[in-house]
Amino acid sequence: MRTLIILFFLTNTIVMAQENISSELPFKSIPEDATNYAAGNLLVRMIEGAGYRFYWATEGLTSDDLKYKPSDSGQSVWETVEHIYGLSDIIRNTSMNKVSIRPPADTPTDWAALRMKTLRYLEDATKQLRNKSPEELAALEIIFERGGKQSTFPLWNMINGPISDIMYHSGQIVSFRRTNGNPLPKGVNVFTGRTKE
């Protein structure tokens, strides 16, 4: 009996800790508007929009949702989130003018850590890019390294590449979870970046 009580207490503690982590994650809502339309701030808002969509697409997913895939040959929700993590890694590294090693070596294998790290990487990028001038942005490049070989691309590719791709795949997750019987939480408004609770 004592073991059951301890187990119950530990389980409740873990669940409460996960809820606290979730409430502290970035992009539950889009931050207040920037005070100017600096080039960096426009890029930041695009990343914030992607982060908001990802936050709510993945909020409240069950282990059954994470395994869901629309067909035998398709990717599961878990695999899609791993891909989004890789995209967030590219965005973060580019914002710091660092090399993005492909494939990323440190992809978390725990759901809470994978989601948290993805959102934190996007948040890190917004902090780096905020208020950057066009000249400062022009100095940034997407740098990939695979098998010891590097390739570079202009920052423009981050808009139609990783940022847009996160939005696209977040939409897939929303569709998959709805098909699996767990629709997006009510009140999510991607236009305002706020969620009515």
Where are these regions (language model features)?
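Acidic/histidine-rich alpha-helical segments that form the ligand environment
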Residues: T109-R146, S151-Y168
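Residues within well-ordered alpha-helical secondary structure of globular protein domains
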Residues: G60, H83-G86, R120
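Surface-exposed helix-capping loop/turn segments at secondary-structure junctions
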Residues: G60-L66, Q128-A138, R178-L184
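Bacterial Sec-dependent N-terminal signal peptides
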Residues: M1-S22
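Membrane-proximal N-terminal soluble sensing/regulatory segments of transmembrane proteins
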Residues: A38-A39
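Short, contiguous alpha-helical
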Residues: E19-L25, E32, V44-E48, Y55, ...
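Solvent-exposed, charged/polar functional surfaces in cytosolic regulatory/catalytic domains
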Residues: R53-W56, G60, D124, Q128, ...
